[in-house]
Amino acid sequence: MRGLKAKEYETLEQLFKMKQGSLLKTMSYFLQSKYKTVKTTADYIYAIGDIPIALVAHMDTVFPKPVSELYYDIRKNVMWSPQGLGADDRAGIYAIIQILCSTNLRPHIIFTTDEERGGIGASVLAQENCPFPQLKYMIELDRQGKNDCVFYSCDNDDFVAYIESFGFIEDFGSFSDISILGPAWQVCSTNLSVGYENEHTYIETLNISALLNTIEKVKKMLQKESIPDFKYIEFSLSTKRWFQDLYNSNGAAGDNDFYVHCKKCKGLFSGYEVFPVKGLDGKTCFYCPDCIVENIEWCDNCGEPFEIDPNNPKKICNDCAGGLLECHSTSKKLKNNLMK
């Protein structure tokens, strides 16, 4: 498990402590030092690179003020703040900075404002024609968890399989900047996990191992000698792969409702009657009311439901299996430890 180096920690600390306006100016200067063509407005920044992939992240957080206290549990490799961390989406900003600073790779870059207020920056940018001369797909770095990839209205199975080949698993998602930009520009897009959990709450955490892992995976995508083209296909329930996998394989769709088989008893139930939960394989499964008690547990730490492993019964989900977070030092003391 690799932790943060001193300079990496300092970069993250600075990102967490900046307001959106200051971050916009800082990112504009940063991109101008790396790219020839950069456009900065009050709503977004973009830079035109030489790799036909765009990396996307948003500069705002849900919290009214930046953090003043920041803690890093070295043993568990997790960051948090009692003021609300704001890793959604400062973790995505950090990931892009690290990719540009540690390599000569120059993908297109998009930084947006006010994603948490409904994607205001992305909506303004979406009104323009795509500014990139070549753009094969977009990667947003703005997803909770460790290995999720979310596709929103993009419904190209070949694209899903390609992204999953780098070690991600398709999951559900409701909204992000690419859910606006992708359809507007007719470009395949995915949102990848950057390690934060419990976003939009004061117990938000950032798993550094997961963040660094995603950074390395994205580098591999950018380093491909041949980057494939993918046709943008609009989402529909009749063709969406997760619909086929989760409903047609485990149940049947009726004329007016979804019907799903309970994983345990195999009974057929309306989608409104069953309980969805992340299974042991990381994918969503369903249990009926009669089978919930024996097969689903609620984590004593985070409160989220998880499927019970009969061979390893426990009261804590896999994501929290390391135990509760512990603060071992102040940020000042931590910096000294990292410098050793």
Question: Residue locations for each model-derived region?
Answer:
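A non-catalytic alpha/beta surface segment that caps or lines the substrate-entry region
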Residues: L4-I51
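Catalytic-core environment of secreted peptidases
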Residues: I45-A87
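Zn-dependent metallopeptidase/amidohydrolase metal-coordination segment
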Residues: I53, I169-T214
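Acidic/histidine-rich catalytic neighborhood of metal-dependent amide-processing enzymes
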Residues: V62, Q83-I163, E170-F172
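His/Asp/Glu-rich mid-to-C-terminal helical/loop segments that flank catalytic regions of hydrolases
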Residues: N198-N256
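Short cysteine-rich clusters marking metal-coordination/redox-active sites
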Residues: C262-C265, C288, C299-C302, C317-C320
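Cys/His-rich microdomains that often coordinate metals
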Residues: G267-S270, Y287, N295, F306, ...
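Cysteine-rich micro-motifs
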Residues: L280-V293, N312-G323
